[in-house]
């Protein structure tokens, strides 16, 4: 899926002092990224504080951020994950209507690791796929959801129509999951879920990376991607190690 940019940046959600959504702040972040060579954004992920927001707040953010990003010609993916299939479908349809290029979702969390079986998660994603006419991406974040998908589950996801995988799981198995998501659909998108494995993901066949680090240092992340595309692994390794230091200094989220 070559239409996806190699770097997608998860935009932080901006708030006012009273806790209200600060849409202009988010627009400023998006403009900053665009001015520094970023052409794709990921909305309402972990950096976007999606578990802390009401559905109405997510709708407001999606509308404002997509309008601004699309005016700049940026590619947009919106996370619509919730514990409720109906609410996730509502968010997915809204994102599609506002011009999102794709939607994504984690598994329906809270009960994910204790009560749901893999077939329950498959049914959740199949329902979202059937509700929209844009690609649906599985956001694998086992640390947050408690569900670590087996390889067979990832292969079955593509059979439901899921178009790709953002992988923030066990990085030792990246190659295996990359192959699994493409077993049924060779064009399925595979995204490394963290800048810490940007280099490793590229080497196992990832289409790109979702990079929170690029919120602060977009030039550093785009330089790493350029080195990879030029086959300069020595320079890419140097930049990857530098990015690891930046990530430690920044902390998570």
Regions found by a protein language model. Give the residues of each.
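Catalytic alpha/beta core domains of metabolic enzymes, predominantly
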Residues: 127, 142-251
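Active-site beta->alpha loop and helix N-cap motifs at the rims of alpha/beta catalytic domains
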Residues: 2-148
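Short amphipathic alpha-helical segments at helix boundaries and their inter-helical linkers
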Residues: 40, 250-253
């Amino acid at each position: 899926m070559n239409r996806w940019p190699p770097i997608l940046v998860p935009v932080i959600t901006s708030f006012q002092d009273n806790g209200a959504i600060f849409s202009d702040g988010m627009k400023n972040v998006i403009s900053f990224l665009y001015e520094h060579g970023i052409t794709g954004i990921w909305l309402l992920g972990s950096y976007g504080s999606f578990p802390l927001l009401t559905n109405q707040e997510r709708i407001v953010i999606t509308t404002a951020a997509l309008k601004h990003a699309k005016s700049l010609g940026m590619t947009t993916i919106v996370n619509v994950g919730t514990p409720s299939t109906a609410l996730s479908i509502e968010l997915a349809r809204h994102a599609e209507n506002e011009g999102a290029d794709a939607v994504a979702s984690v598994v329906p969390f809270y009960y994910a690791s204790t009560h749901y079986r893999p077939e329950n998660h498959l049914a959740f994603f199949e329902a979202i796929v059937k509700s929209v006419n844009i690609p649906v991406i599985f956001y694998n974040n086992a640390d947050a959801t408690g569900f670590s998908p087996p390889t067979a589950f990832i292969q079955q996801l593509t059979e439901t129509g899921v178009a790709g995988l953002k992988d923030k799981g066990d990085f030792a198995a990246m190659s295996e999951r990359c192959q699994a998501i493409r077993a049924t659909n060779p064009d399925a998108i595979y995204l490394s879920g963290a800048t810490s494995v940007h280099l490793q993901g590229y080497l196992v066949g990832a289409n790109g990376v979702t990079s929170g680090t690029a919120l602060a240092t977009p030039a550093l992340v785009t330089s790493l991607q350029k080195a990879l595309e030029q086959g300069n692994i020595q320079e890419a390794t140097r930049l990857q190690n530098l990015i690891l230091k930046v990530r430690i200094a920044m902390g998570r989220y």
